[in-house]
């Protein structure tokens, strides 16, 4: 399966590439300012991962456009950290500042669907971020699929059910975002989560969507 990793100039990008490769994917890395979305759409990718990055969605090159265009073309798309924030913003959500969290282990509760299928809940994950998606601004098209446990936050700081939003999912398009890092050693089930994501790409390829 051919997977695009859209690189937002992040040190974690090649950890993602390594994990995806170990899962059998043929991975192509393209930096966020080295191609247009139209150029990438015709390359026959079966799935897309939009990487973490050190900036904001507004500074993430083609990421904002990509997280809409690929799902709208039927290509499963996963945003990680900055990619997750870009997904929320691209569909009308708001990204706000949050107290910096770097290399923090925490537990999240999830809904057990799609990328979280067969994964334990609570799930231990590693967080590295200073921006979050603000719950009250999410459009109806997006649903919250995971939040932190025992980490209260106000709605203004991205609070959701007493915690910070850690994953979102589009209700009708194959697009998901995760605030945490599946490629971090602090996320023991990260490989399993990415395997679930690639399974969606495989189904899309078999169905002739991608």
Mark where each language-model region is.
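Acyltransferase
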Residues: 185-210
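Short amphipathic alpha-helix with an adjacent loop that forms part of the alpha/beta core around
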Residues: 36-44, 137-140
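Cysteine-nucleophile active-site neighborhood
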Residues: 42-118, 122-124, 194-196
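A short beta-strand-loop structural module common to alpha/beta enzyme folds
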Residues: 26-35
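Catalytic beta-strand/loop cores that center a nucleophilic Ser/Cys/Thr
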Residues: 112-173
């Amino acid at each position: 399966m051919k997977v695009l990793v859209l690189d937002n100039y992040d040190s974690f990008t090649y950890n993602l590439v390594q994990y995806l490769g170990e899962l059998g994917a043929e991975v192509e890395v393209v930096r966020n300012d080295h191609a247009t979305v139209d150029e990438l759409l015709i390359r026959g990718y079966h799935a897309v991962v939009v990487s973490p990055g050190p900036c904001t969605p507004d500074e993430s090159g083609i990421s904002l456009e990509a997280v809409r265009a690929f799902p709208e073309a039927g290509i499963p798309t996963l945003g990680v950290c900055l990619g997750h924030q870009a997904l929320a913003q691209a569909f009308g959500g708001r990204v706000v500042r949050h107290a910096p969290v770097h290399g923090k282990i925490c537990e999240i509760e999830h809904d057990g669907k799609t990328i979280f299928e067969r994964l334990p809940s609570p799930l231990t994950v590693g967080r590295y971020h200073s921006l979050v998606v603000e719950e009250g601004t999410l459009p109806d098209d997006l649903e919250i699929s995971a939040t932190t446990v025992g980490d209260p936050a106000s709605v203004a700081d991205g609070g959701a059910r007493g915690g910070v939003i850690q994953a979102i999912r589009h209700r009708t398009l194959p697009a998901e975002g995760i605030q945490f890092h599946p490629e971090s050693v602090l996320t023991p089930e990260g490989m399993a989560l990415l395997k679930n994501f690639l399974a969606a790409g495989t189904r899309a390829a078999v169905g002739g969507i991608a």
